[in-house]
Amino acid sequence: MSQKDIYNKYSNQSADDQQEEDDDENQESSCQLSPEKDLGESLQGEDLDEDQGVIGEDDEEQEESYDEEDEEEDDEENNQDQQNNSESNLQYDKTNQKNQQTEMTDNQNEFLAEDYLSQIKTNEKSELKYQLDIQSNLSGENVQDMDEKLKQYIELNGKNENQQAAESKKIENDEIMKKSEENVHEKVVDNNQKLNIQQNNINDYQEDIKKDQSNNLVDIQQNNEIIKEVNSEDQQQKNEMDNKQSDIVLAQEESKQSEQVEAPIVKQKKIELRPKVIYDPKNDVDQYTGDYSDSGESDEEANNEDDDEDEDDESENESRSRKNKAQLLKKKNNKKEQAKKQQVKKVYKKQTLVLNVADTKYPVVKFVGKKIFKWKLAYDMESMDFDIFWTDNAVQPEQLGRMQPYQKINHFPGMFSLARKNHLARNLMKMRKQFPDQYKFFPQTWLLPAEYNDFKNQFEKSRSQQKIFIVKPEASCQGRGIFLTRSLDDLNPSDHYVVQRYLNKPYLIDGLKFDFRLYVLLAGCDPLRIYLYYEGLTRFATEKYQEVNRDNIEDMCMHLTNYAINKDNPNFKFNKDKEKMDVGHKRSLTSVLQLLEDQGHDVNKLWKDIKRVLIKTIISAQPTLAHHYKSCQPDNFMNNMCFEILGFDIILDSHLKPWVLEVNHTPSFSTDTPLDSYIKKNTIRDSLKLMNCTCKAKNEIINQRKEIMQKRVLTGKKVKYTPEEKLEEIKKAQQKRDEYEDKHLGGFERIFPMEDDEDDNFTEYMQYALKCYEEQTGANIRRNTKKVTEDPKKITNQPKKLNQPKDLEKIYNTKIGAKLPPRKPNSQTTINKGIPGQNGQRPSSSQLNEEGETIQCEDQEQNKDEAIENAITRSASGRMHDFRIKKQNSPYNIHQKFKNKIQNRVAIGVKELKLAEEPFQFEENINGKPSNPNVKKIQAYITSEKEQLEIKNMNILQDQNYNSSRAVQAKKPQIEPQVLFVQEPQTKKLQILNQAKPPQQKLQFQLIDNTAAQMEEERRQWLIQAQRNLQYQLSQQQYQPQQKLTLLPKGPPIHPQTNVMQSIADIPNSSNSKEILAAVGGAISGQYKTDKRVTIKQKGQIQNQSINQLKDNNGLFLQPKLFEIQSFQSSQQQQAQQAIQSSLDQNLIGINQNMVGLNDLFVSGKSHKVQPHYQAQQDSYSYQKHNSYSNYYQK
């Protein structure tokens, strides 16, 4: 059944019930008239004439006419009601019920009128009472009609004599009236019951309608889905039909071409594929199901069957081929249709945002997200699948760096600069020194223990007038650890505290101290966007305020207004009604401002002062916030990934001047009172609205990122903006934010950027805050810019010099983006030029020329910025002169580059070249700093000197028969040992080394030379004593002839090789002289290997080795069995061991590079240069002790 049918059903039932009630009432009225009529006849008596009967008949006719009129009126009213009900259809509200009740009361009044008319007609003498009753029970219109009828009746009768009789029967009529009233009451009760029944029926009717509506909605949805499916199928069929027709046309064209070639005279037959057409009256469009009926006949065949009989065979073949093609197309289309049907339709859910509340403990946050915004809540701390992340803790930069551009978090990294008391005090005190009048809203503060001495002076200055200080921990909340003091003895100089002057004259309300908790929304840090919520909290102390004295200095409930401290006081009054915000010890901000205004204070001026104080406080930390934000999200032009609700604590002094006490980056959102829940819930809701946390904004950001990625894929380059383009993009983004935020402010007011900032120059404050931040972090140090001469043509005309360090410098500058001043090339010492300098003196900065031989210092020409930079570099590097070595120009990089060249040459068969420096000096250097680069510069000169010495030594060692000169000396009965462990340094080589040193190493090398000379003298004395001991032993032993050694025409002598890598501490107890001699050589080398005895290699092994491969013995060749050596006595052996061990412990062996070992120093024919070792701790070039002292010798 439809809604209309159900409604008509109930309306017809109600109309039938009303008709039945009217009939019953008419019957009752007729029953009541008969006794009244008899009563009237009895009252009239026998004196009445016959005319009265005629009059009675007229009355009956009138009554019948009245009854008919009343019935017609009732019928008309019912018809009208039905019409109204049919027009309204579904108006079954309470208004219909009230109308029905009024209709029932009208009908009751009409029924009463009919009853009284019948009574009054029988009782002609009760006219006055009848009129009174009519006026009391009928409406005004019916009374007038009845009065006219009565007048007519009285004129016809003309009898007033019966009035006396009517008065006599007044009591009887009263009884009749009571009975009629009782009957009417019963009828009213019955009508009420019927009304209740009708109301129940109406409720059932409403429920049925709701059910029908829900069923209809389901049916409509199903119908819509069916229609969509049908339309999709129709479109698929159309597409298939079009494709098939196009295939048929192509087939026909191909057949035409083939027929024209073979038999051009024969006419082609037209064959059509006629799909089964299904007529749709709604769309009136031809549709097909995919079934084809191919007759193979055309119009030409029907008209010319007799003439074209020869063409039937060819047409049949063509039709068969076309049928086959059509069947193949059908199979393909059927497969596609089946594949489409098998695909599951994706049901797209309504997009909602995800709020991560895993790191918050406040239920009000979850309520706002779940109930107000209908968001999905997430409780996984490590998950990155969220849109808004709400946390109660500080945010690290790494977390912000991992976020996507559409995600948001409720904290800024680097907010410690405002939230920590020590950082806030440091920033505000710096600003106060520069702007003393503008930043005088923060109490004077000292940071202990750094400023303990300054704070101590405050007590010495104010001995006569003792001042009160409030002491706070650096990082605490809820008033923990705060106390007041007058004495310095209460403080420990080593503890970390923030000490402030106590405001001893605050503004009081009801004798209580109070402060404001203001909620400030920081919506962006670069540029700043600050909003202030119109409502806040006012927190009162619970004890009456008095000036600080010895008795109340420890009463924190008097001096502190923190809720966590005062809520446990028995005097604390909770506000249990949010509508009464001016009651208790926690009130609303607006109620207190209204109270101040009622007291006659200028609240508008106070509110402006508070806003300026908030802006200046945030500006002091703006550079820190901007740096952290940009480093994590450099391409976020909207500046909307972070937001933070800050809790500012503001106190008023006796002059209504606002003072900043502290800033809370995680204000409490606990809802202990209805006032808390009302204010904090609205604050969170409006802040999330203001930050545009919507699906629309999220999708816009995602689409923008997709466009950027598409451009990058197409162009193959990353989209880079110039500084001007970045400023334009930022300006556009901020304008877009302004348009949205101005429409969705809610309870917030934008206080920065301000429109009327004429009084305060905020840009000047921000510039100075940036300057303070750069000085604190060292970001203001700029690199020296290139000096450009007045005539740029001179630079272009100059020939280009090939200078490897300079080219490396250019590469370094391009990598780091810095610009260094042009640097003169280092000094280059060659053999032809000789020794740099004059008369062996080291060149000074004034003697250096501009041709690239030495380094030029320009201390006098540097400006202020350059001087600062040089001072910082000197302090950082620890060097004594302004001398910088490029990283690319370091010896290590040069060594590696040369080594790579050698490897490349070896790969193509070129003879391998080896560097003189040992690899351990770079690989085992923990500090990673290179050796002295100037040693490489004098390598050629030293090599030439070594070659000359080598030739001299070779002439001494060789004779005409290529025998060793030591064999001639062995024939003598007594010979002196020719094994020398030390050779005096050559003066010429010392001059070369001293003059090749750079000027910045002057003092270091002087110290090294002095210590080396001292160590050399001690070593000489020890070795002389060792030689004497050997001579004494030789004098006591028999003589043994020396083995003959043969020398090749070129290169080192061929003889058994003795390895001298054994420590003197492990000298074996043996009578063999070669072991003792080799042990002494092992003491020089300072390195100990696994074999405790001297290893002797064979001649074949030494012949196969090249000069550069002799590294294990460092080119040191000892000839064994030159003479017989007896073993030491035990006492002498112990003394020798102790002496050598002490020299090893004191690092007296192998330190000086000028010390050369043995007479056979250059026997190997190859020079190994001495490489100094760099020590980072001393930050200078020095020679470091190593396991292998022999690596510092030139063998």
Swiss-Prot record:
Top EC class, one word: ligase
Keywords: ATP-binding, Cell projection, Cilium, Coiled coil, Cytoplasm, Cytoskeleton, Ligase, Microtubule, Nucleotide-binding
GO cellular component: ciliary basal body; cytoplasm; microtubule
Residues annotated as binding ATP: Q500, R501, Y502, L503, K513, D515
Localisation: Cytoplasm, Cytoskeleton; Cell projection, Cilium; Cytoplasm, Cytoskeleton, Cilium basal body
Coiled coil residues, start to end: 59-103, 144-260
EC number: 6.-.-.-
Cystine pairings recorded for this chain: none
SUPFAM superfamilies: Glutathione synthetase ATP-binding domain-like (SSF56059)
Keyword Coiled coil carried by entry: yes
Compositionally biased intervals (Polar residues): 90-110, 825-849
InterPro entries: TTL/TTLL_fam
Biased composition (Low complexity): 80-89
Compositional bias segments (type: Basic residues): 322-334
One GO-annotated biological process of the protein: microtubule cytoskeleton organization
Origin: domain of life: Eukaryota
GO molecular function annotation: ATP binding; tubulin binding; tubulin-glutamic acid ligase activity
Domain named TTL: residues: 350-703
Region (Disordered): 1-110, 281-343, 783-862
Segments of skewed composition (Acidic residues): 17-27, 44-79, 294-316, 850-860
Pfam families: TTL (PF03133)
UniProt xrefs under PANTHER family: TUBULIN POLYGLUTAMYLASE, TUBULIN POLYGLUTAMYLASE TTLL7
Biological role: Probable tubulin polyglutamylase with a strong preference for beta-tubulin.
Entry comment, domain topic: The flexible c-MTBD (cationic microtubule binding domain) region mediates binding to microtubules. It is positively charged and becomes ordered when bound to microtubules: it interacts with a negatively charged patch on tubulin. The presence of positive charges in the c-MTBD region is essential for proper binding.
Name assigned to this protein: Probable beta-tubulin polyglutamylase
